């Protein structure tokens, strides 16, 4: 018996008050639907079907990299109708698992428990007990605790309102059962929709075993209906990430002011992360790295014993061991700092390699530049890499010394151990082991008087 997963993702999401389809809104930097797909893939299904509606082609275009079978529900007539669109693509003998694109934190552990504890011919649902179940379908049991049915909130009788055990919507049964039950559904309810939950009563009527598996926590089955619910779930997720990292040996100064936005974040023990740090995409921090406050790291690797000072923004960079960056530094994509390199305050780099032991400490722009080892780049140095049409490369060889306020008009090469005098503007190569100065000689104009205002 193979596993086929159906993810329902066709809801309109009106309460999000957004032009972006709800399932494309991110949690922890990843779209809600993508999170559910990633969890489903951990179960090794042979197929993942996604039933989509609201947002249509926009959803598919944005998430076209996902390994799923897309099925459009042109009319949103309820969850039962949505599953009916996908079930023809499932083999009769398949075990079908139904998930929701706006329930992003469901855990593989809970889903495995559901699959393992549901008889091969039975029906299983994930349930949860909430202090306030308002708006959610209730689990109706008999005097012996057996599940009889699920009643949606709008159809709940007054005496059932006190029930706090709710249906999460997550369900598993065979494809054959669903092919038999789904055509029997009707829309005789307050919402005039075909409820998937009505299959529970049909199963009970047939004598089919129906069981419930409890969620590990309320948050893992929390659906996202509006921005506030998403905000609360985001903070819960970030606390989980902070706890996980802390237990692995990472110091998080304040878990409430830490954000990890990506799946591939690897942090070694003895790393210290100060407040308001954002980690995005693929981030790797080696041992003894220190990240100052208000730092953004995106798709970046940082070597051991390196310190990133406050208010630095770093994207798609490689920073090797024993480096220092910032404060107020910006490293754009393609920046590489070799071991022991130093980038100081108000320095910007793009597509630039700063060699071993080299430093650019202040007020500098380095673009499309290859810098050797033990180079000193003085304050105010600018590589003029763009001529209005094309980008050009600057090369600064080992041991060079660039004075303050120097403009290097690419393409050019500064030779090994060359010295460039402060205030120079170079448009040609500077030879090695020589002092190159390109500025007008200082002069004083005698007898000059400052202009005065006319009376």
Curated annotation (Swiss-Prot):
Main location: cytoplasm
Compartment list: Cytoplasm
Quaternary structure and interacting proteins, as annotated: Homotrimer.
Homology family: In the N-terminal section; belongs to the N-acetylglucosamine-1-phosphate uridyltransferase family. In the C-terminal section; belongs to the transferase hexapeptide repeat family.
Region (Linker): 228-248
Domain of life: Bacteria
Binding residues annotated for acetyl-CoA, in chain numbering: 379, 385-386, 404, 422, 439
Top EC class of this enzyme: transferase
Residues noted as binding UDP-N-acetyl-alpha-D-glucosamine in the record, renumbered to the chain: 8-11, 22, 73, 78-79, 100-102, 137, 152, 167, 225, 332, 350, 365, 376
Alphabetized GO MF terms: glucosamine-1-phosphate N-acetyltransferase activity; magnesium ion binding; UDP-N-acetylglucosamine diphosphorylase activity
GO cellular component, one term: membrane
Cofactor annotation comment: Binds 1 Mg(2+) ion per subunit.
Gene expressing this chain: glmU
EC number: 2.7.7.23, 2.3.1.157
Region annotated Pyrophosphorylase, chain positions: 1-227
Required co-factors: Mg(2+)
Catalytic activity: alpha-D-glucosamine 1-phosphate + acetyl-CoA = N-acetyl-alpha-D-glucosamine 1-phosphate + CoA + H(+); N-acetyl-alpha-D-glucosamine 1-phosphate + UTP + H(+) = UDP-N-acetyl-alpha-D-glucosamine + diphosphate
Function: Catalyzes the last two sequential reactions in the de novo biosynthetic pathway for UDP-N-acetylglucosamine (UDP-GlcNAc). The C-terminal domain catalyzes the transfer of acetyl group from acetyl coenzyme A to glucosamine-1-phosphate (GlcN-1-P) to produce N-acetylglucosamine-1-phosphate (GlcNAc-1-P), which is converted into UDP-GlcNAc by the transfer of uridine 5-monophosphate (from uridine 5-triphosphate), a reaction catalyzed by the N-terminal domain.
Protein name in UniProt: Bifunctional protein GlmU
Keywords: Acyltransferase, Cell shape, Cell wall biogenesis/degradation, Cytoplasm, Magnesium, Metal-binding, Multifunctional enzyme, Nucleotidyltransferase, Peptidoglycan synthesis, Repeat, Transferase
Pathway membership: Nucleotide-sugar biosynthesis; UDP-N-acetyl-alpha-D-glucosamine biosynthesis; N-acetyl-alpha-D-glucosamine 1-phosphate from alpha-D-glucosamine 6-phosphate (route II): step 2/2; Nucleotide-sugar biosynthesis; UDP-N-acetyl-alpha-D-glucosamine biosynthesis; UDP-N-acetyl-alpha-D-glucosamine from N-acetyl-alpha-D-glucosamine 1-phosphate: step 1/1; Bacterial outer membrane biogenesis; LPS lipid A biosynthesis
InterPro entries recorded: Bifunctional_GlmU, GlmU-like, GlmU_C_LbH, Hexapep, Hexapep_transf_CS, MobA-like_NTP_Trfase, Nucleotide-diphossugar_trans, Trimer_LpxA-like_sf
Keyword Lipid biosynthesis: no
Record: active site: 362
């Amino acid at each position: 018996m193979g596993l086929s997963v159906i993810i329902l993702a066709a809801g309109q999401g009106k309460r999000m008050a957004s032009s972006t389809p709800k399932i494309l809104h991110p949690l922890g930097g990843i779209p809600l639907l993508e999170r559910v797909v990633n969890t489903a893939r951990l179960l090794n299904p042979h197929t993942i079907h996604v039933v989509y509606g609201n947002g249509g082609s926009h959803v598919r275009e944005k998430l076209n990299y996902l390994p799923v079978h897309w099925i459009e529900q042109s009319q949103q007539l309820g969850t039962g109708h949505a599953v009916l669109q996908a079930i023809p693509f499932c083999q009769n003998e398949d075990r079908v698992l139904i998930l929701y694109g706006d329930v992003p934190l469901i855990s593989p552990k809970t889903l495995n428990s559901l699959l393992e504890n549901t008889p091969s011919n039975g029906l299983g649902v994930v349930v949860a007990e909430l202090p306030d179940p308002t708006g959610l379908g209730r689990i109706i049991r008999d005097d012996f605790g057996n599940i009889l049915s699920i009643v949606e909130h709008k159809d709940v009788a007054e005496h059932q309102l006190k029930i706090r055990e709710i249906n999460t919507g997550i369900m598993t049964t065979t494809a054959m059962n669903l092919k038999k039950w789904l055509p029997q559904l009707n829309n005789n309810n307050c919402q005039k929709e075909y409820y998937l939950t009505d299959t529970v009563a049909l199963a009970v009527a047939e004598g089919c075993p129906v069981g419930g598996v409890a969620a590990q926590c309320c948050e893992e089955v929390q659906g996202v209906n509006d921005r506030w619910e998403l905000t609360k779930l985001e903070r819960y997720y970030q606390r989980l990430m902070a706890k996980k990292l802390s237990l692995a040996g990472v110091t998080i100064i304040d878990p409430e002011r830490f954000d990890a936005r990506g799946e591939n974040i690897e942090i070694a023990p003895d790393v210290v992360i100060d407040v308001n740090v954002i980690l995005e995409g693929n981030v790797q921090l080696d041992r003894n790295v220190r990240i100052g406050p208000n730092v953004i790291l995106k798709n970046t690797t940082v070597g051991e014993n390196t310190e990133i000072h406050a208010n630095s923004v770093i994207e798609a960079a490689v920073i090797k061991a024993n480096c220092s960056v910032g404060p107020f530094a910006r490293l754009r994509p393609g920046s590489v700092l070799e071991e022991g390199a130093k980038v100081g305050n108000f320095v910007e780099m793009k597509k630039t390699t700063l060699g071993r032991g080299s430093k650019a400490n202040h007020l500098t722009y380095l673009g499309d530049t290859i810098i050797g080892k033990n180079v000193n780049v003085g304050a105010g140095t600018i590589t003029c890499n763009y001529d209005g049409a094309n980008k050009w490369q600057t090369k600064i060889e080992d041991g060079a010394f660039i004075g303050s306020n120097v403009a290097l008009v690419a393409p050019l090469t500064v030779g090994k151990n060359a010295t460039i005098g402060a205030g120079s503007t170079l448009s040609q190569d500077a030879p090695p082991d020589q002092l190159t100065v390109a500025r007008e000689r200082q002069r004083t104009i005698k007898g000059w008087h400052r202009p005065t205002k006319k009376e």
